[in-house]
């Protein structure tokens, strides 16, 4: 049975916690990641030093283009005011060459860390409610990092540590199913974690932006991706109440770190900016 990213790691971490009850840290590492020599030490030392740190990632570089950042996390994940995730070194499908532009400071607070290679504080992981298995694949780590943030934990990127990631291994880089999950899950984590008024405002704006994205897919002769966007919205509306009115008593809040107070869609598609800094 394929439990997905969330289900697989949740099961593994429950077993590990039971066997090693005093374990402090664990690394979620995808099978298509190639760590570099010495990558682990700076992550572990930082976690030991900073008790408020819930999760940390290394730089994620492209296995096929070693001088470039890789899609899944690059130099640390951010979120724009419309709820679109992007990363330092990666906006939508465009990735930057790693020229050391994000190397200083060595540790930077971000909003979300890459699930491809993610060191977590085990206690924070369980305190935050584990990975949400309803998301199955794509953006589960963003949801987890958001909930860690709500519990008072910080998320960081360590640029003195790096790994290479092949990417697109589960569903493929241009899979319509990946498009479906990305659009649906990004909406679900907003209504789940953002204050209700903020979430409703964002969803209203996303109707326009996602429709524009669908039109772009059609213009590019990718009708299956347009259908995926439409399916994503119908699925989101069906699951809305389940996520918006969760039985948990967890507070909802907008991110404190790693938030870009602008529209990444506007800057990328209209202003043609391929790199966006906070």
Language-model features, listed with the residues they occupy:
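Conserved donor NDP-sugar-binding/catalytic core segment of glycosyltransferases
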Residues: 33-84
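Short glycine/serine/threonine-enriched helix-capping/active-site loop
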Residues: 28, 55-63, 158, 166
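Short beta-strand-to-loop acidic/aromatic patch adjacent to the donor-nucleotide binding site
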Residues: 21-34
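Acidic metal-phosphate-binding loop of nucleotide-sugar-dependent transferases
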Residues: 3, 32-34, 135
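Active-site-adjacent helix/loop segment of glycosyltransferases
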Residues: 151-248, 253-260
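Short, flexible, basic/aromatic active-site loop/helix in glycosyltransferases
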Residues: 77-110
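Glycine-rich, basic loop-to-helix element that forms the pyrophosphate-binding segment
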Residues: 1-19, 42
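A short, conserved alpha-helix in the catalytic core of glycosyltransferases
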Residues: 103-162
């Amino acid at each position: 049975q394929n439990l997905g990213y969330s289900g697989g790691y949740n099961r593994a971490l429950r077993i590990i916690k039971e066997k090693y009850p005093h374990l402090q840290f664990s690394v979620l590492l995808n099978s298509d990641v190639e760590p570099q020599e010495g990558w682990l030490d700076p992550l572990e030392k930082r976690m030991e030093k900073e008790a408020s740190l819930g999760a940390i990632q290394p730089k994620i570089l492209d296995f096929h283009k070693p001088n470039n950042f890789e899609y899944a996390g690059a130099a640390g994940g951010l979120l724009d005011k419309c709820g679109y995730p992007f990363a330092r070194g990666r906006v939508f499908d465009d990735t930057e060459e790693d020229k050391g532009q994000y190397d200083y400071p060595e540790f930077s607070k971000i909003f979300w860390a890459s699930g491809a290679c993610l060191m977590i504080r085990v206690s924070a992981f369980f305190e935050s409610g584990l990975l949400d298995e309803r998301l199955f694949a794509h953006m589960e780590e963003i949801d987890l990092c958001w909930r860690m943030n709500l519990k008072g934990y910080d998320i960081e990127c360590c640029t003195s540590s790096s790994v290479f990631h092949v990417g697109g291994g589960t569903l493929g880089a241009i899979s319509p199913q990946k498009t479906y999950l990305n659009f649906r899950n990004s909406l679900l984590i907003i209504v789940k974690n953002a204050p209700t008024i903020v979430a409703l405002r964002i969803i209203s704006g996303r109707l326009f932006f996602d429709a524009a994205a669908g039109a772009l897919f059609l213009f590019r002769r990718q009708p299956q991706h347009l259908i995926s966007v439409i399916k994503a919205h119908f699925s989101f509306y069906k699951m809305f109440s389940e996520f918006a009115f969760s039985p948990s008593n967890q507070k909802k809040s907008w991110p404190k770190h790693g938030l870009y107070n602008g529209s990444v869609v506007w800057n990328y598609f209209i202003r043609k900016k391929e790199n966006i800094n906070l």
